Design a protein with these regions (language model features):
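Flexible, low-hydrophobicity surface segments
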Residues: 1-50
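Active-site-proximal alpha-helical scaffold in enzymes
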Residues: 2-6, 150-160, 189-198
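Short acidic, glycine/serine/threonine-rich loops at helix termini
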Residues: 12-15, 119-121, 144-150, 179-185, ...
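Helix-loop-helix junctions that connect adjacent transmembrane helices in secondary transporters/permeases
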Residues: 38-126, 291-372, 499, 576-587, ...
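Glycine-rich loop/linker segments at domain edges
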Residues: 51-97, 186-272, 350-360, 426, ...
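C-terminal catalytic domains of large/alpha subunits in multi-subunit enzymes
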Residues: 127-132, 161-168, 197, 223-347, ...
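Thiamine diphosphate
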Residues: 139, 143-165, 169-170, 386-394
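Catalytic phosphate/nucleotide-handling subdomain of diverse soluble enzymes
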Residues: 351-415, 421, 431
Length: 657
């Protein structure tokens, strides 16, 4: 419905009557996969969108398969099941876009992470040339993956063509955001492991079933990424077998969300590690240290290499901060209704999407008349602090102060260089390489122009906004050089540089979380007393922003662990809590002090030794809290969230109530 104003549109909607043919509600993936289940899409009669089955190459041994290892009586055998829930991104700004026609072209202003991709999808959807579409992303904040999908912009672009090119605003409410945009996939994991007496993982298997809701969205890629992450963090000495299913149901369709399947798999693998350690009487920290991904590890399927790792140092640093050894001993064998525990979890996370998908980014630099530099990017700032870091990178590559770099903080596909956008913790790694490359080219152009002005000088360099010679003598300021370049009758030139980084490498970021909790058993209440994340994200470009990024991710992880869940009426399939009153996000009043620590490594594949940090802080929080509850109570809770009702049921089943 398109109307002059919102009131008219609402009145018109009330005049529309829709008749629905009701079908049985299928909300769970297991229901949808059962024989005789209603078929949601005719092209997938079993409701399975996709399936994958991966086996690592087996070394020469007496074992012919992973299953043989998992049945070998010489090893300790573990089996378990872990389930995660559906949650929403809850970015403060809901999806919104404006569309109008200008000079025969469609202009769309939208809150998006991927403006260049939005333009392409609009063109494909409408069957028109991409050059006849202009997409503008203003300076906005918040997306977490939900604005990585093109949902409303093609509709809005089409609507403006139906009203004579007039401006159309498509503003999505919070309730519509919950119901009709994307969310995090609920995924179930059935896992098995074989472990020898020296705490070494010999083999593991994982079967993951992802609830895709009614539409494909990112499809199978998220659960595929999840089982890949399950394989990578720890080393299997003999072999690994993973199977993954993506299944259609009647839920709202999940899609990309911070971590892209890794928070789900991390809950499974880190709960499994603690459960094994508890059954064997091992220290969970020592068990993890005995099995970490080694430096130089190469994934057997995608070839991603571990170029640097500080994970062992992260674990020790976090353990020292929380007082791991002392608290583990102190909190053993507790009694009473209120108990405390300490838990941990580790993670690995790749940086960007290569080699699974394209990784490319471009940058442009333009000399201003006062000697400062204009930086143009297609990479998007969505609140993560990217523009600040990009300015720092450009300044370092050129050799000028950061305040002399003026970044264009919005993207316009008519003028911005191409970049695929903000997702996969890629921008400081992929776009950063483009910035470094262009910055070095720009620097050489400045020095080459200075050499024309001072042909007898040698060893030219840029220092403190000056061109200096090999002896360190100042020859000309950058401001004067710029004025000369613009207005000299003999040497006028507009100094610019532009280039592309087609990234064909990847690397792993690492880290861990330690949490101390207090559990009120009779009421099922978990209070986080202390929590610390320790990250190896390579070299930190901006430590203050890095700390802020970690704090935000930890907050999101606490909600994932304890309170957040999209709930549905099992009879009708209706979402019951699609608003910020009934959907329980934690606030600052629910958090302890959030501590972020770092172990800096110098990753040789990163533009400045840096690697992923955007998504990782969320990943290990939920399993660390769950494992702390396990130590406090002795009860293994294998589903998220750890809500009071669920905990009371589990504690009752465990004989504590």
């Amino acid at each position: 419905m398109v109307a002059e104003d919102e009131i008219t549109a609402r009145r018109a909607l009330e005049l529309i009557r829709v008749e629905y043919e009701e079908y049985p509600v299928v909300l769970e993936a297991e229901q949808a996969m059962a024989e005789g289940a209603p078929v949601l899409h005719e092209e997938h009669p079993d409701n399975v969108l996709a399936k994958m089955d991966l086996r690592t190459p087996m070394p020469e041994s007496d074992f012919h398969s992973v299953e043989d290892v998992l049945a070998c009586p010489a090893y300790y055998q573990f089996r378990g099941r872990y389930d995660t829930q559906q949650v929403q991104h809850c970015h403060i700004e809901n999806p919104i876009s404006y569309a109008w026609m200008e000079g025969g072209r469609i202009v769309v202003v939208t809150s998006t992470q991927i403006p260049h991709i939005v333009r392409r999808v609009i063109g494909q959807a409408m069957g028109i040339g991409w050059g006849s579409i202009r997409v503008i992303k203003p300076y906005i904040g918040g997306g977490f993956g939900n604005k990585q999908e093109v949902l409303y912009e093609p509709l809005n672009a089409w609507l403006t063509t139906q009203v004579g090119g007039r401006c159309v605003r498509l503003d999505v409410s919070r309730e519509e955001t919950f119901q009709n945009t994307r969310s995090r996939h609920p995924i179930s994991f059935d896992v098995a492991a074989a472990v020898d007496g020296d705490m070494r993982l010999m083999a593991r298997s994982c079967t993951a079933v992802s609830n895709q809701g009614g539409y494909a969205s990112h499809g199978h890629s998220i659960v595929a990424n999840a089982v890949t992450g399950f394989r990578q963090l720890y080393l299997d000495r003999i072999g690994h077998h993973s199977t993954a299913y993506t299944v259609y149901t009647n839920r709202p369709a999940p899609g990309a969300m911070r971590g892209y399947g890794i928070p789900q798999c991390n809950f499974a693998v880190e709960c499994m590690m603690d459960d094994i350690a508890r059954e064997k009487g091992w220290d969970p920290k020592a068990f993890r240290l005995a099995n970490l991904m080694p430096l130089g590890y190469v994934d057997p399927f995608n070839g991603i290499t571990c170029h640097s790792t500080g994970l062992a140092e992260c674990i020790e640093k976090g353990a020292d901060f929380i007082g791991w050894a002392e608290l583990r001993e102190k909190y053993q064998n507790q009694t009473g209704p209120v108990r405390r525990g300490v838990g941990m979890a580790c993670f690995s996370y790749k940086t960007g999407v290569y080699p699974i998908s394209l990784e490319t980014a471009s940058a442009r630099m333009v000399l201003n008349q006062d000697g400062t530099v204009q930086l143009h990017l297609g990479a998007t700032e969505i609140g993560q602090g990217g523009d600040t870091v990009f300015s720092q990178m450009a300044a370092q590559a050129i050799g000028i102060p950061t305040e002399d770099v003026h970044i264009v903080s919005f993207q316009d596909t008519d003028t911005a260089p191409f970049d695929t956008g903000a997702y996969a913790s890629r921008q400081t790694y992929v776009t950063g390489k483009a910035i470094k490359k262009v910055g070095e080219e720009f620097r050489e152009k400045l020095l080459a122009y200075a050499a024309e002005l001072f042909p007898d000088a040698s060893g030219l360099d840029i220092r403190e906004r000056q061109i200096v010679d090999g002896a360190g003598e100042a020859l000309i300021s950058l401001a004067d050089l710029a004025m000369t370049a613009f207005y000299s009758l003999e040497h006028s030139v507009h100094i610019t540089a532009e280039d592309t980084n087609h990234c064909k490498e990847n690397t792993f970021a690492f880290g861990c979380c330690f949490a101390e909790v207090e559990v009120d058993i009779p009421v099922g209440k978990v209070r986080v007393l202390r929590i610390v994340n320790v990250h190896d994200s390579g070299k930190l470009i901006n430590p203050a922003l890095a700390e802020a990024q970690v704090h935000g991710g930890m907050s999101m992880g606490i909600g994932y662990a304890l309170t957040e869940e999209m709930k549905f009426d099992p009879k009708t399939g209706r979402l019951l809590n699609g608003n910020l009153l009934d959907y329980k996000m934690p606030t600052s009043m629910d958090h302890p002090e959030l501590t972020a620590l770092f172990v800096e490594t110098d990753d040789p594949s990163g533009p400045f030794g840096n690697k992923a940090l955007g998504e990782p802080p969320t990943i290990p929080v939920a399993p660390a809290i769950r494992n702390a509850v396990l130590q406090a109570t002795g009860v293994a809770v294998n589903t998220l969230p750890l809500s009071p009702q669920k905990l009371v049921e589990e504690f009752t089943r465990g004989g504590l109530i």
